[in-house]
Amino acid sequence: MSRVAKAPVSIPAGVEVTLNEQTLTVKGGKGSLTRVINNAVNVVIEAGVVKFLPVEGVSNAWAQAGTTRALVNNMVVGVSQGFERKLKLVGVGYRAKLVGSDIDLTLGFSHPLVHKLPAGVTAECPSQTDIVLRGVDKQLIGQVAAEIRGYRPPEPYKGKGVRYDDEVVRRKEAKKK
């Protein structure tokens, strides 16, 4: 049985949570997010907290309640503080440049790659080899970061590629004669 759902989500000052049938909307200083709640979960909003209760008779209701609680907590944190993901480009000639709402990547291919940023994600390039993605939706930030990393994942022999800032690349030794 999941114990995650037993802890309520506290609503900080400046954040408004509303429930309309099975649609939960969270509004805050950085934006607003909407999510459809699973039918196996009852959501109760009271006195600055959101509680999640499983529906009786549904076999995986506790699991769904725990998942819903984690997703709603990420929504509350996103609209109040926001999320950020840092990427680092490692390799000779690897560069990133922000052009409008697109990221222009030079990753050793014969052509530059242009990655279009979806709505709700902003990017910043403090240096030519660093990318900082910011937004309110944790899942969307992670998805965009994974797509950019997917163009040139770090390889184990020289460590070249696009990596997360906190990622440790396991290095291999080259073949010996």
Curated annotation (Swiss-Prot):
SUPFAM superfamilies: Ribosomal protein L6. It comes from the Bacteria. One of its GO terms (molecular function) is structural constituent of ribosome. This is Large ribosomal subunit protein uL6. Gene3D superfamilies: Ribosomal protein L6, alpha-beta domain. Transmembrane segments: none annotated. Pfam families: Ribosomal_L6.
